[in-house]
Amino acid sequence: MDQKAYIDQAAEHFRALLTEQLNRQARMSQGSPAKDFSRMERIVIGLIPGDGIGPILMAQARRVLEKLLAAELACGRVELRDIEGLTIENRTAQGKAIPDEVLAAIKDCDVLLKGPTETPKGGTLESANVAMRRELDLYANVRPVSVPELGIDWTFFRENTEGEYALGSRGVEVPGMLSMDFKVTTDAGTRRIARAAFDFARANGKTNVA
């Protein structure tokens, strides 16, 4: 292809990305209510073993959950549901970061406990974690850090569905000459992660937000 053809192809690609992200911005601006688990009659916890040592870890995690939630499991308030198929073998065979049947099973759950998943080196298969964040709109990455002897009690809120992660694998390339990746930051996305951090601070008696 000549230079003009590459430019035309990239322009069409960018048009599609921009349209997609503007539509996403519009959906976020409308907002959606969060689940109130205290009002739910039944909570389904999905368990995804993943790859490598994931099944070993998940077996022990299940033991802990069964102990901690014994009363809730006995009365049917909570269900532990195994979700199979999010393995490197199945994802590679289907050519999808999250196979359709696995994604459907995930969306039927209220809470998800997931083991580690491997991302193949090379190729174009997206990380299952990144795909899951996008498909389920898991925008808030919440990381608490506590070191009492140093007086540290911090909670970090990181936007999980924007930045380089969102579009980093969907750039454009002119073979042998250049490649470009994209980063997305929306007004609605910025506002909601900031709001989540402030709401957390208010609910937990925190007085400093930075």
For the regions a language model picked out, list residue spans one by one.
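General structural feature for long, well-ordered alpha-helical segments within catalytic domains
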Residues: 2-6, 10-14, 49, 57-65, ...
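Nucleotide donor/acceptor-binding cores
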Residues: 41-43, 152, 206-207
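Short, ordered loop/turn segments at secondary-structure junctions
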Residues: 50-52, 85, 117
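Glycine-rich phosphate/diphosphate-binding loop of Rossmann-like nucleotide-binding domains
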Residues: 46-62, 68, 175-210
